[in-house]
Amino acid sequence: MSAQNGYEWQQTERDVWTRTCLGHEAAASFNENIAYGHTELSVTATFRVHHPASSGIAGTDQEQEDLVARVRDAWIRTRYLRPEVAVEMTTHTDASIPQAFTYRVLRDEVSLRRWVDQTMAVVRLGEPGAESLEEVCAYTYNRALPTPGKQSMLYLVLPRLADEKDRNAHFVWNVSHALADGGSISELYNVLLQAMIDASPSTDGSVYIPSDQELDVLPLLPRSVVAAYRQQHKPSAADEEAAAETARDNLRLIQAKMNESLALQPVTNWTTRKHETICIRRDIEADEARELIKFGKHIKSGVTYLASAATVLATAETFPERKASSTGALMGMVRNARRWLSTEPVEGATGNRTPLGSDAVFLWIPVDTQKSLEPSFDGVPELVSVAARIRSELNKHLVSPHCISSYPVVAEFAQGALTNHWAEIEGANRSAHTPNAEELSKIIGPQAPGFSSVGALQVHSRFEPASPSARASGLWLERTDSAHRGRQVNASPWISMLMIDGKIKLQLGFDAKFHDADKMEQWMQRTYEWLLVCAAAASSSVGTVAPISARL
């Protein structure tokens, strides 16, 4: 097998497919292994199955039993329609050995039942450990995936017993970042929820058995964006070297600018603290979101750039100890390679599904730090100016698909850096003497702010059965909410944003070993209030008002 073919799926034995990870999927899997599950995602969806009145099961125990059976069968079917949920990953931390994926085709009921037992859990609100959806989510993002090979895990969260006001159920999809990003979350949920409403649970307790067509998983197995790019764009050696040099330039930028950058300041006593992921969320309701979008259009800037600029300015005021000596900010920004890839298989490809397309680049953004950067109408011109700079700098990294050629180089560097970094962290944690502040700052120093725009989450709000008779009966599924959170086991928290149902949702996950919750709350609140100021500026005369953060 050639090295290149090793990055495509190969059948190594009957019903077993394997391939070597390539690019950021390799780095993501390795990062999860060495950092106790760092970046594993917990993505929620809230829904209700509406049964026809003639069924007579609404509000009964039978309704809940039907729901569990539907979800079980839909989860099995999704195993074949979106096979990444059942892909197993290597779990080693040896950077010299490639990360790899394995997918096993299961055909019999015994194997499928065993897989469901390993990867699906049913909990009910009100039970111990499940007082709220947030508590269930917190459980999932405060431990690494427990499934064999880090396969996805699906939690079905049932409503409280006898709660007549809220009969909604919830999903928490817990998944490796090596196999999902903001762009592919929607695709998974659309498949899973449709499979739910299409399900016809058996009355004898047997489970769904995939059809022969569904068992043909090769066209649907997840490809690396690097492999898909190489096949579609056929980069030359010069393209690959230019991309690698651009990536090295980006690493040099971080080294050159960190000392003069606005930054998050980790705690100095982190060796005495335990890892704990805390997720902070803020929602901008639909009316204010419309005003924010309106403001962005007026100044010819997208909400992504306004929100990333708000993140920078919020950093300055939350960590003022860096402000006086800073001339700007290193800013981490996410981009997505799928913008350059065909959504249909190109000639010679068995499939073109690439559930992980995102990566990050760092930008240098000059900021006038000699003024107040608290949220206020007076500060809007500075925010708009910073947003324009971010857009201009990011666009330099969006000009050519050949940047994808750099992903294997960056991933290899990342795995080496992570190995060294975690050796230093664990060494400091185990040290017989307490390292001094200077020693600790060499291991965990100031952190550049980062922003990840997931974009619009295109999960449908209504699902009807494919069967005409089932549809005619009045059976349907309503999806009413969705959100995302993630496990954080490092010192570099990022703020992320998505839009769904007209709302804009901000999320900040951080590791309490390295950051104080109060500081993270302030950082998120300032970012959020900057966006509210922009929304208000869309329909108000912009005058001088006191900084909103004065009311924190």
UniProtKB/Swiss-Prot annotation:
The keyword Manganese does not apply. Induction: Expression is induced when cells are grown in cultures containing vegetable oil as the carbon source. Transmembrane segments: none annotated. InterPro entries: CAT-like_dom_sf (IPR023213). MELs not only have high potential as eco-friendly biosurfactants due to their excellent surface activity, but also have attracted considerable recent interest because of thei runique properties, including self-assembly, anti-tumor and cell differentiation induction activities, and moisturizing and hair-repairing properties. Its EC number is 2.-.-.-. Keywords: Acyltransferase, Transferase. Pathway: Secondary metabolite biosynthesis. GO terms for molecular function: acyltransferase activity. PANTHER family: ACYL-COA-DEPENDENT ACYLTRANSFERASE MAC1 (PTHR42034:SF2), CHROMOSOME 7, WHOLE GENOME SHOTGUN SEQUENCE-RELATED (PTHR42034). Acyl-CoA-dependent acyltransferase; part of the gene cluster that mediates the biosynthesis of mannosylerythritol lipids (MELs), surface-active substances that enhance the availability of water-insoluble substrates. Belongs to the trichothecene O-acetyltransferase family. This is Acyl-CoA-dependent acyltransferase MAC1. It comes from Pseudozyma antarctica (strain T-34). The gene is MAC1.
